[in-house]
Amino acid sequence: MHKDFSDAQAFSKSFDDPARDAWQRPAEVIEQMKIAPGSVVADLGTGTGYFVGWLSRAVGPSGKVLALDVEAEMIRFVAQRAEQQQLSNVEPRQVAADDPGLAAGSVARVLIVDTWHHIDERAQYARKLAAALAPGGEVWIVDFSADSDIGPPARYRVSPEQAVSELEAGGLKAEIVQGETLPKQYIVRGARPPGQDR
């Protein structure tokens, strides 16, 4: 699914709408991820940077948040946001649509919110994410449920079972996260199998 996200200011009205907090539940998502202070995390498909403040606080001053997006305008917007909010540990980066541009073994967590369904060749992409994970690293996908009243058209949605399958095809051990309370989304976690730890 390809959509024009080049107008960051316009998308900020919906992406950063305070009403989003009620269904996105960012505090719950971050808590589930168990991010260690001082770690490096990636916010893949960062958009206008809705999650960067939460991630910045989770990793702390000695950690780093890589805010990744394919749209140059989104990256400019996030850079301004990080400067205004004094998030010195946020590093916005423009990446290619088919490559997260992450060095091998470089990140502890990758958060992918409302973005997985936009990626083509997801199993191949998952393989690149798996290679980027440090020992104990995890990929977290948060995307729209089939019955959600918001999100992409039904034909573009990716089921949690499909997301699990795609992460596993990329070499990760994946599962649907149980016990979360997001009303419009699911969470899937993919971890590096222990034997792959370097």
Question: What is the predicted function of each stretch?
Answer:
Residues 42, 46-100:
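Class I SAM-dependent methyltransferase SAM/SAH-binding core
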Residues 138-164:
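Conserved class I S-adenosyl-L-methionine
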Residues 56, 123-138:
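A short glycine-rich, Lys/Arg-flanked "PGG" loop and its adjoining helix->strand segment in the class I
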Residues 1-42, 50:
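Class I SAM-dependent transferase core
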